Regions:
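Noncatalytic alpha-helical scaffold of FAD-dependent oxidoreductases
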Residues: 1-187
Length: 187
């Protein structure tokens, strides 16, 4: 049966069944939530690294533009790339600080009063920096980078079956992603 499933997917889960005394359940779930917050922040920091690598390339993809202004692609990109790199560096610094100080910030990270958000902290500002048809390929690649990095995100899932008293702790992973497997092992 496993061989038949593996022909159709490269995904599987690392599974652990744990008996948690009911009075300790909240402590256990908070511990798992902290692990998930740390894993999420690490994934978002990997996104910052991937975006920095992209914007550090010597050439970036550009779409159609009006050459009548006489401004070269390099001139049009130079300032925008510097703004993008500064934005990403600032967000990376913020998120790194949250990861470093996860213990005292746990309550705010858990209730989302502190929220590491690709959409609001990176994507929206990049859309402002790279506005216009000529820069659509740049934004398209940023979204593709986000999807690739997000695909490797590791998290820990919990569920219980009625009556067995076990907490089933699962870490879904893709078997073709070595870094994801290592992150799951570390979690």
């Amino acid at each position: 049966k496993t061989a038949a499933i593996s022909r159709h997917t490269n995904a599987f889960k690392i599974n652990e069944d744990v008996v948690i005394p009911l009075p300790r359940m909240a402590e256990y779930t908070d511990g798992i939530e902290r692990i998930n917050i740390e894993l999420s922040l690490r994934n978002k920091l990997a996104l910052c690294e991937a975006l920095t690598d992209f914007f550090s390339q010597s050439t970036l993809p550009l779409g159609r533009h009006d050459d009548a202004a006489g401004i070269s692609s390099a001139e049009r990109l130079e300032d925008r790339v510097a703004q993008a790199l500064a934005l990403i560096d600032g967000v990376r610094t913020l998120w790194s600080g949250w990861l470093r100080d996860v213990e005292p910030l746990f309550a705010q990270l858990q209730d989302h009063s502190l929220r590491a958000s690709w959409k609001t902290q990176i994507r929206q500002p990049l859309q402002q920096i790279f506005s216009g048809v000529a820069f659509e390929p740049v934004l398209k690649e940023c979204n593709a980078i986000h999807q690739r990095v997000l695909k490797g995100r590791v998290w820990v899932a919990l569920h219980m079956h009625a009556g067995d008293g076990n907490v089933h702790t699962n870490i879904p992973v893709n078997s073709d992603d070595y870094e994801m497997l290592q992150a799951a092992h570390g979690a």
